[in-house]
Amino acid sequence: MATLTPRQQQIYDLIRQTIQRTGFPPTRAEIAAEFGFSSPNAAEEHLRALARKGVIELTPGASRGIRLRAAGDTAQHQFSLPSMGLMQLTLPLVGRVAAGSPILAAEHIDRQYQVDPSLFSAQPDFLLKVRGMSMRDAGILDGDLLAVQRASEATNGKIVVARLGDDVTVKRFQRKGRHVELIAENPDFEPIHVDLDRDEFHLEGLAVGLIRPAAP
């Protein structure tokens, strides 16, 4: 790893620990709050310095678009498929989901991935290929593989995989009484409002981490 200043090391450690705890990197605002910076712009300057030193990669326009890079730029890092020596957990990769059938039905499984379970905040049950950019500001991009733990309930603020009628979506969960709001992390997308007494809704699981396949 490149030589970091004490403050850069603290920020790098915060990113790594947040990913290990939650499965996702912190936002600029969260970094600023943690270190008492006057604004997220100050955090951005430190992140750019870390990127110049080659220890992280930044995704423009995404508030959680921070990716750790391994020493030597091997691309075997927090968000990439791990090396053969670390492969311990076999997870099915779910592609497109047909209407009316279980998400883990055999016809939905594109392939099996072997991954290191320590990459995730909790043990996942499957991977879901992300389609679209509605969760861009959470650092979840089109083509990413979202690690999902099966669950039928979620607490407010969690990122979930939900089925709405014939559609499967990844959104942030917010519930009040019999009403659920599924919130995108991209201002171009409106929230989805669900009436549990009227709409066909099923929670498939909770996001517990992310794999970003290395570019070819």
From Swiss-Prot:
Keywords: Autocatalytic cleavage, DNA damage, DNA repair, DNA replication, DNA-binding, Hydrolase, Repressor, SOS response, Transcription, Transcription regulation. The active site is at S134, K171. It catalyses: Hydrolysis of Ala-|-Gly bond in repressor LexA. One of its GO terms (biological process) is SOS response. Pfam families: LexA_DNA_bind, Peptidase_S24. Its EC number is 3.4.21.88. The record marks A99, G100 as: Cleavage. InterPro entries: LexA (IPR006200), LexA-like (IPR039418), LexA/Signal_pep-like_sf (IPR036286), LexA_DNA-bd_dom (IPR006199), LexA_repressor (IPR050077), Peptidase_S24_LexA (IPR006197), Peptidase_S24_S26A/B/C (IPR015927), WH-like_DNA-bd_sf (IPR036388). Residues 28-48 bind DNA. One of its GO terms (molecular function) is DNA binding. Belongs to the peptidase S24 family. Homodimer. HAMAP family: LexA. Represses a number of genes involved in the response to DNA damage (SOS response), including recA and lexA. In the presence of single-stranded DNA, RecA interacts with LexA causing an autocatalytic cleavage which disrupts the DNA-binding part of LexA, leading to derepression of the SOS regulon and eventually DNA repair. This is LexA repressor. It comes from Ralstonia pickettii (strain 12J). The lineage of its organism: Bacteria, Pseudomonadati, Pseudomonadota, Betaproteobacteria, Burkholderiales.
